[in-house]
A protein has these predicted regions:
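Surface-exposed short loop/turn segments
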Residues: 82-153, 230, 241, 261-263, ...
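Mixed-charge, low-complexity intrinsically disordered segments
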Residues: 116-136, 165-167, 171-178, 249-256, ...
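Beta-strand/loop-dominated core regions that host nucleotide or nucleotide-derived cofactor-binding catalytic loops
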Residues: 243-308
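A structural "domain/chain start" motif
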Residues: 21-88, 93, 98-101, 106, ...
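Short, conserved beta-turn/loop elements at beta-strand boundaries and strand-helix junctions
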Residues: 114-117, 222-224, 247, 275-278
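Bacterial N-terminal signal peptides
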Residues: 9-16
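Bacterial N-terminal signal peptides that target proteins for export
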Residues: 1-9
């Protein structure tokens, strides 16, 4: 009976290991410029400003590896150049396939409203004023999470933020404060934006919780040794195990044009033997046939090796 109980405990422990591994791995995400569907116009681009704020918040959360926005802009520029036919497509990035990032976050600003009532006039002296002005701000965002391999929309979520200030107050004249400036964060609109961004980070983390960590084959040294993207910055460690899948052609609904994903063929298991900051080396106990650069490596399907 004791032997049987030990066997059951061993099995349960082994099953728990992939989940533990997945929990420590950080998915690589990229944030694109937000589309502005409001009438707001300012000195700073609302689309770029919101994307920068979300990028910073995702980085500060510590839950993701966030692709630098300038790198994303460079990739998009390369894609645009490829689509124009001015470079060979074989040597360029494919639209919708950002190899470095697993998830592309796209956003739309649907509401960006600020209303004021009352007056800031009143007693003024030395550049300061005492007034009784009430300000209310509201912002609405639509966030979409896109699989960069297939272009499939994994989730779509609306988030919003509201803030207000009012009553007797003393302060410097802040009329004309522009989005993205130092004084903006202290305004009702700045606070509303922060609320929406914080909600967006929480929603993104929740939606991606059950999405398996994914990396890419970046080099094939032999049929049993390869290099994968990610490395130490994503939490990959020596001894971690993954499953390799070859990626087939993208499947598209002929009627709607909807991206249905790609056929994935399981090739086998690999174990990480060494780790660098941005990539890792892994080996397989048996030959992996037809593995190529760009194939997918997933976590959570094989057991992580236990420490001796």
């Amino acid at each position: 009976m004791r032997l049987r109980n030990l066997s059951i405990i061993s099995i349960l422990a082994a099953l728990a290991l992939p989940a533990a591994q997945a929990a420590t791995l950080k998915k690589i995400v990229a944030v694109s410029r937000f589309e502005n569907k409001t009438s707001w116009q300012g000195q700073v681009s609302l689309g770029d400003g919101m994307a920068d704020q979300l990028t910073d918040a995702l980085m500060q959360s510590g839950q993701f590896v966030v692709m630098e926005r300038q790198t994303l802009k460079d990739v998009v520029s390369e894609q645009d150049l490829a689509n124009s036919g001015r470079v060979q497509k074989a040597a360029s990035a494919q639209t919708g396939k950002l190899v470095s990032a697993q998830i592309l976050v796209k956003g739309t600003v649907t509401e960006f409203e600020s209303q004021s009532s009352g007056s800031e006039n009143g007693v003024g002296f030395g550049g300061f004023r005492i007034g009784n002005k009430k300000e209310e701000a509201h912002i609405g965002l639509m966030i979409r999470l896109i699989d960069t391999t297939t272009g499939e929309v994994l989730a779509s979520q609306r988030v919003e933020g509201k803030a207000a200030s009012g009553g007797m107050k003393v302060g410097a004249n802040v009329s004309g404060v522009q989005f993205g400036t130092a004084g903006f964060d202290k305004t009702p609109m700045g606070k509303a934006v922060q609320m929406a961004i914080d909600d967006a980070v929480s929603q993104i983390a929740a939606k991606l919780k059950d999405v398996p960590f994914q990396a890419r084959v970046i080099k094939v040294n032999s049929d049993s040794e390869l290099l994968i993207s990610g490395g130490a910055k994503t939490g990959i460690a020596e001894g971690d195990s993954f499953t390799v899948f070859s990626v087939g052609e993208s499947l598209v609904d002929p009627t709607t044009g909807e991206q249905l994903g790609s056929e994935l063929t399981k090739k086998g298991a690999i174990k990480v033997t060494s780790v660098e900051e941005k990539y890792a080396k892994a080996k397989s106990d048996s030959p992996l046939k037809d593995i190529k650069v760009g194939d997918i490596v997933k976590a959570g399907e094989v057991v992580k090796s236990a420490a001796p």
